[in-house]
Amino acid sequence: MRLKKSIKRGIAAVTITGIMASSAMPAFAKDYHIEYGDIKVDQDKVSYTDKDGTKYDNEKNEDGDITITGKSDENTVSVKDADVTFKDLEIDRSASSTAADGAAVSVSGNSSIELDGKNTISSGMGHAGIEKADDNGTMTIKDDNNVSGSLTANGGFGGAGIGGGNGADGSDITISGGNVTANGGGHAAGIGGGSSSSSGGGNGSDITISGGNVTANGGTAGAGIGGGDGDAANGLNKESDSTGGGRGSNITISGKNTIVKAEGGAEAAGIGGGRSGDADTIEITDSTVISNGHDSDNGNSGAGIGGGGFGAGGGAGGGISNITIKDADVTAGADAGGAGIGSGNASGLIIYYPNWKDEHPNEGVASDITISGGRVKASGGDDSAGIGGGYLGSGSDITIKDNADVTANGGKWGAGIGGGRGGDGSDISISDSNVSASGGAAGAGIGGGRGGKGENVTISGSSTVSVKHGPGATLTSGTCYGAGAGIGNGGGKDDVRGEEIAPDISGIDSTGQGYINYYDSDNNLLTRVPSAPAPEENDSKGDDAEPALSASMKQAVSQLEVRGALRQNLMQDTSIVQQDYDADAHVLTIRAELSIATLTGTLGSLKALQAQGVTTIALVTQHCTSTLDLAELTALGGEDTVFSLVHTAGIPALSVGGALHNELIH
């Protein structure tokens, strides 16, 4: 008996111990399956349905590891102030035709979504694919587990891919990792605002991308990243004088491994404003970004990065202030009406405001654009600058510095850097950077677009700047517009050429190889650097001076010109320019006591020298000596093709027929 009691007591003790141990252990991680029903997560409580159809309300998840998986075309997920994992989750509610059906995924408060596997979320009418349901807290999408998690989020009509639903803003959104694709529904952003309505909405703000590979495509009139369709609220009009939504602001992209591709919908920016929406404070650092604005075949494009375009409701088109690009690799482009980086089409101003420049001087303006280091290529659509204003937009307070490498190409009627068609370009500063700027037809290389003014251009430090003016052009109506200036004004009606302005070059460091080369509206290649000190004079020519040129050689040489910094021909001024010919070496040497000099003529004049036996021509200036092989040079064009060999302090440059051929300098 005592033995049996002892055994019973032992069994009881073991049982009690097991129960105590079991109650102290946390619940194991649990997967919640969307195919069984809706899933609602509120902090650490989960409401769900299991595979047997049993419903659980506010069941506490002890370990906080909440994984949602499975496939459904009718059930939804809502997350509030919680951290969840999407694992191979597929929800397709795209067939939903009423907004009352709700978003496929709704997120509120401070919440995060970890991406594992392949996840695809699609909402129906009026909702974002992943909808930021309130303005409280930040929604974060991440791949902290580094398992190459992916997400494709598709908005329904009026809903962003990730962000706001119809009539709602999309704000406080962070993406820190994963392969993320966000496709906006009609009139909504890829990431950001939904479509605006008469009661507001449509703005996209406080959007941060700090990691991952992100692709964002706006729906019609929605930005890739930023604002939805502001024109849905009638945009800027005479009655309301209000943009009504579509703004993209406080957008930050950073991280060396971050890659972002953004495509705006019709009349919207790639990154920035939706249709009729402006943009404010866009920062891109250390990352790779490709961003394009688009039109709807009517020339109303938004910018690649910046403001949206003008829409049918009378929107003015988006201006932009405060774009900062630092140590990033950025390619930005736009269709007709939008700048590569800057503002979108502002032509709504013409329709609604005959005196728009006086009544709305800041609409469509691109200002406070700073590029510091990195590589940037910006191409404007027709009527727009590469960097600066879109159609009717001005570009001002543009700064390029800190060894930036920038290429800016204006579309037809736009400046390379400065104003779009009808827009001015002012307060443009370039320091210690490599810049190439080309204007479109009638646009300045740097300055005003067609009919616009250019002023206050400063170039300093060890900058190397190459500028090409836009040529003159004729409209189908027969109206002729003159060529734009290299640096200065755009061309005007009646073939009036853009007036050149003198840039402030007092701060250029010529000893550090700084210079500026540009073509003026007469297609003359100009080179400007500060004057360098002349070398000490040496009147002794020695006993080995070359003999004087023969009469026939002088005749051939007279077809060439040597121009100084003021473009005057100094070839016949023997106190400055001398020529000698070494018949044994067949070398014609032209010496000019100048720091800046241009040897120019036609290839026909060089062929005349070849007929005299010359095979090589040398230009010797105060700080530089360069030689050209005439056979190589004359093979590049016909008799009337113009060549120019430019010496800027110690730097030579050769152009033939308007194209650079520095490879032929010896």
Q: What residue ranges belong to the model's regions?
A:
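A composition-driven surface/loop motif
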Residues: L3-D543
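Long, contiguous ectodomains of secretory-pathway proteins
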Residues: T69, K80-K87, D92-S94, A99-D101, ...
